[in-house]
Amino acid sequence: RQEVFFDRTWNSLIDLYSYGHDIETSWLMDRGLEVLADPAYTEKLAPITAEIAEAIYEKAYVNHSLMNEAEKGVDDTTRVWWIQAETVVGFINAWQKKPGEKKFLQAAEDVWEYIRKYLVDPREGSEWFWCVEADGTPIHKPIVEPWKCPYHNGRMCMEVIRRMNDAS
């Protein structure tokens, strides 16, 4: 688990387990290791990123989607757009590292279906909803605002295309 908010001397300000940041970190670190192509770093860090993905799968993957976070041990079951996008890539990445672990590929496919069913706003020309309740009901938030843009979902699409092309 990563810490996410700090004071000026790097003390954690809040007891927050950010599931989205952890799954995002798992694949971004692996991508960085791929680019660096340094076996020493890969040997040290690849097992850690695998553990992160496994922990997120076990702790936060519920009903074909990833919960938002846990503050002081209490889960926020909201499903946030960027977390679902990062989860698709993170679980594909975990499957690519361990092709025998079909649960990760199945989870990535299930999260994609969840996104299509609940997060994609069906109105023509629209975007993904910011977030939905655990039951898939959209929560009223702007479709686009300073913290909500197609960065994560766009990157997810590009990563999935790249990774599936590499796999074939």
Model-found features: residue ranges?
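Glycan-recognition and catalytic cores of secretory/periplasmic carbohydrate-active enzymes
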Residues: 1-168
